[in-house]
């Protein structure tokens, strides 16, 4: 009996247990906000929601939607350019620590959506006419994503994206950097 008790105590006290994170088919909901093109939040911002599903090697598939708005100064007013995009992509796990608390991913995504220039109004208050029009947009994004787990089900994220979109008249490249929260749902 003494021997069995000693084996039990050793089994419970030896080694270090770490959380079960990034297991295959585990899913999380990510909510992110970001600065766009180095502009202040009052002039350019984005926000999005993403569903991520982990694969057997710790990488993840992501599917979600995003809203991006950038205001362009014109005379004494601003002209808003808004993009509504859907994203689907794959993020490869590049680095993790032994305790599975910190993860670094590099990813590539396909994007498709719609861009609205001045909410469809082509005539400005001073009588000028906008040449840029609303359009369907498509393209891709490169992403660097860092996750730090605060608990087994909650992670703080940092992201840097470079989006390249075609089909619009207002610029093809947008750099975004932001933060977000991830909640593991299963």
Task: Label each residue range with its predicted role.
Residues 19-70, 182-186:
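Short glycine/proline- and aromatic-enriched beta-strand/turn motifs that initiate or cap beta-hairpins
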Residues 20-29, 57-61, 100-106, 134-136, ...:
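Outer-envelope beta-barrel architecture signal
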Residues 27-33, 47, 61-65, 88, ...:
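Membrane-embedded beta-strand positions of outer-membrane beta-barrel proteins
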Residues 52-125, 183-186:
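Gram-negative (and chloroplast) outer-membrane scaffold detector with strong preference
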């Amino acid at each position: 009996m003494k021997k069995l008790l000693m084996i039990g105590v050793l089994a419970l006290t030896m080694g270090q247990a770490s959380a079960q994170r990034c297991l295959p088919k585990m899913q999380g909901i990510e909510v992110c906000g970001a600065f766009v093109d180095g502009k202040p939040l009052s002039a350019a911002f984005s926000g999005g929601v993403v569903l991520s599903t982990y694969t057997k090697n710790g990488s993840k598939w992501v599917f979600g939607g995003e809203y991006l708005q950038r205001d362009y100064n014109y005379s004494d007013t601003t002209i808003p350019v808004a993009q509504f995009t859907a994203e689907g992509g794959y993020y490869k796990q590049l680095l993790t620590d032994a305790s599975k608390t910190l993860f670094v991913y590099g990813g590539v995504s396909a994007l498709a959506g719609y861009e609205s220039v001045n909410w469809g109004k082509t005539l400005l208050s001073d009588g000028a006419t906008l040449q840029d029009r609303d359009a369907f947009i498509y393209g891709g994004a490169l992403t660097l994503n860092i996750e730090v787990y605060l608990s087994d089900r909650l992670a703080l994220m940092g992201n840097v994206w470079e989006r390249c979109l075609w089909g619009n008249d207002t610029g093809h490249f947008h750099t975004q950097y932001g933060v977000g929260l991830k909640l593991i749902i299963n």
